Design a protein with these regions (language model features):
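Membrane-interfacial helix termini and adjacent extracytoplasmic/periplasmic loops
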Residues: 4-8, 50-58, 63, 111-112, ...
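A structural signal for multi-pass alpha-helical bundles of membrane permease subunits
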Residues: 31-46, 81, 130-141, 154, ...
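Transmembrane alpha-helix signature in integral membrane proteins
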Residues: 71-104
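N-terminal signal-anchor/first transmembrane alpha helix
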Residues: 1-39
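Membrane-helix interface segments
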Residues: 74, 106-115, 143-147, 188, ...
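Interhelical loop and adjacent transmembrane-helix boundary motif
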Residues: 6-15, 44, 60-74, 216-248
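Transmembrane alpha-helices
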Residues: 20-21, 30-33, 163-167, 173-175, ...
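Cytoplasmic-entry segments and transmembrane alpha-helices of multi-pass inner-membrane transporters
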Residues: 14-22, 96-133, 178, 202
Length: 248
């Protein structure tokens, strides 16, 4: 955006300083991705830039790792698991998180702040501690090493995001609308689905996106709670880097 002709020297300094700062932040966020992408075209089975790649020699580049991704059963199964587990975890997170947010928005609920702090604690507690706790709890109830165990574990991580986004949407909600619906004979469920849900839908969708991304990217909890049969894509990526140092 161009500066107006009447901008003072101080305003010009601030403007260009601001643009420089934004550029540095953008570079800091994008540079790791820019570095990783060329490595996926490495012709060698090493997670490093070869002399041929640095010299831009075509012999140093290959699509072999992409072929491996789509043909190797380990990668295809991990991708399938992620595409199954993440939507299911998102559905559970959205259902429970939305109900919790709507319930906590009621004025007559006691200890709302305490309950809210407990519900969003998975965002605060270190992930390794949450994962260890889930491992012992799910082992005791027979869910460790099962698909539903991983789904519920990821749902626990996603619920706080749904609660926060839906609660933020409910701040501007007009309570007189629910009272008007009730006065016209609508029950609580009908009032929720016909009046309240359409108005808070942006918050629900935002929370669902956060919950899906959290589940799809998560690796620590699934290592504790899951087994080889529930190996997700991030887990397979972690294994490939740790054991094989593979660019795939």
């Amino acid at each position: 955006m161009a500066l107006p002709s009447y901008a003072s020297p101080a305003q010009k300094i601030w403007h260009y300083s601001y643009l420089t700062m934004c550029g540095l932040i953008f570079f800091f966020l994008i540079f790791p991705i820019v570095v990783i992408i060329p490595l996926s075209f490495n012709a060698q089975d090493f997670f490093t830039f070869t002399p041929e790649m640095l010299a831009l020699d075509p012999a140093g580049f290959s699509l072999k790792h992409y072929v491996d991704f789509f043909t190797n059963p380990d990668w295809t199964q991990a991708t399938y698991n992620s595409l199954v587990i993440a939507p299911m975890a998102t559905l559970v997170s959205v259902s429970l998180g939305t109900l919790a947010a709507v319930g906590l928005s009621q004025s007559h609920v006691p200890f709302k702040r305490v309950i809210m702090a407990i519900l969003i604690s998975p965002m605060i507690v270190p992930l390794i501690i949450s994962a260890a706790g889930m491992y012992f709890f799910f082992s005791a109830i027979g869910l460790q090493g099962t698909y539903w165990g991983v789904v519920l574990a990821h749902a626990i991580l996603g619920i706080p995001f749904v609660i926060i986004t839906v609660t933020a949407t409910l701040v501007g909600f007009d309570r007189s609308l629910t009272r008007a619906a009730a006065s016209m004979g609508a029950g609580p469920l009908r009032t929720f689905f016909k009046v309240q849900l359409p108005l808070i839908l942006p918050g629900v969708i935002s929370g669902a996106l956060f919950a899906f991304i959290t589940s799809f990217d998560e690796v620590v909890v699934v290592i504790f709670v899951g087994s080889a049969g529930q190996q997700t894509l991030p887990w397979q990526m972690f294994t490939g880097l740790r054991e094989q140092i593979s660019p795939t």
